[in-house]
């Protein structure tokens, strides 16, 4: 499964390289395929852990392959996708130099995402928390970026400023200290067979009604904001406690 993840991520990079920044139909179709390949790779990545635990074939080698696959699919592939979609023509001319004649600003910006993904995965490999992730998981960040060409093909293209802002925001969240819950640890104790069937039926109905990509996109966005909301609530609580200790020490001592 890890190799399937890596393979489809590599396919996405190759497909992205055959398109060019612009709004023509052919390029949009190529970018759509590149985004869908990232989603297929995410399916392999999602099945990898449960299958390994079910079959009892977990190993250090598998963990390393999983990290390399995630870096390819959710780090390099989204960076290549956004570069080809928006940044390949973003250059700063250099009149004072013979070689090169321009500064490839687009290349530098697109490299931010794989750099942050690599750091995020390396940090995950050396610091384990059974209940939560520190920083946005790279598969979620990569999936979010993969939806940009999907929404652009089915609806309206995402303007360059918004696409870049989202691209950089996802990269920053990966290396942030924002904590995200592990769905398998949080939801598993509350799921029964009946609830699982009901949930699957609801998801299937929503996919039929709204379109599969909007349902998955909503789940991804909901997960991203869940960590941010918890982070800001915790931050406000710390500020309030610090305020009480500094400006109302007497009240706290009398309680």
Model-derived features: where do they sit?
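The first (N-terminal) embedded transmembrane alpha-helix
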Residues: 1-12, 73-77, 140, 144
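Alpha-helical transmembrane segments of polytopic integral membrane proteins
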Residues: 10-13, 40, 78, 115-118, ...
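Multi-pass membrane catalytic core of lipid/isoprenoid biosynthesis enzymes
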Residues: 1-3, 35-36, 54-120
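Helix-coil boundary and interhelical linker segments in multi-pass alpha-helical membrane proteins
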Residues: 11-35, 79-108, 148-163, 209-214
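Active-site His/Glu-centered metal-binding helix of metallohydrolases
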Residues: 7, 43, 47, 51, ...
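C-terminal membrane-associated helical module and adjoining short loops/tails
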Residues: 131-255
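Topogenic membrane-insertion module of multi-pass membrane proteins
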Residues: 1-46, 219, 223, 230-234, ...
